[in-house]
Amino acid sequence: GAWSFVREDCYVMYPEDNLSLVRLELEADIEYLVVEGAVYLYKTTGDDAWLKKVLPKLEKGIDYMMSDEKRFDKEHGLVKRPFTIDTWDFTYLPDAGVNRRINPNSPMSIMHGDNSGVYQAMNQLAWFNRRLGNEEKAREWEVRAEVLKGNIFKHLWNGKFFIHQLHLNHNGLDNLENERLSLSNTCDINRGLTDTEQSRSIIQEYMARRERTDCFAEWFCSASQCLLQVL
């Protein structure tokens, strides 16, 4: 089972039900997706009592992503993960099929989609707090979101779209990361990270690459690969 792919602190066993809950250690999208799920549930039910109960745990999850050495790169002020394809849950290493751990020598990188997800979650936590009358706490989350946004654009925006990965302790597999258009660019738009012109720039890049490549998807290729297809 998937529990064998991770460390003991990343799963909970329920032998009486023959079930396990597993957090694939290398994934960096769990906490912000839980916040997003809570937004959908709250908008459906309007249950303020439930929100008061779960909000501290939701905030704890995002605080963890923004502080734990395993998850956060202090130098860039951004969330990190092992080097995967965009938001996928496996690396390029030979044991990727059975190893979803973060090891001391794991190749670590910063992926824009993880950070836009945390950015959205911070604004959602602000909205939650404001719904409960916690204006000061709401503003704190909004300020933190703006700081994160600044770091995202400083380190990951190439003027046209967000680069695939910013490598930290390794050099990657090629020199194309700055021009590789990965699928989470569209998620970045939907999460409110980009303004109108930035959103238009991302969409135009997708459209241009579709015209220049016969790859199975326009976000799969780098700009140079698209050019090779034309030549």
What are the residue ranges of the model-derived segments?
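Aromatic-rich carbohydrate-recognition surfaces in CAZymes
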Residues: 1-81, 111-115, 119
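Flexible glycine/proline-enriched surface loops and loop-helix/loop-strand junctions
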Residues: 18, 100-111
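Short, solvent-exposed loop/turn segments at the edges of secondary structure
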Residues: 27-30, 85-87, 181-185
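Polar/charged alpha-helical tracts
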Residues: 49-52, 105, 135-136, 208
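Catalytic cores of carbohydrate-active enzymes
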Residues: 69-81, 110-111, 117-229
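Alpha-helix boundary/capping detector
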Residues: 84-91, 171
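A short, charged helix-loop
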Residues: 88-103
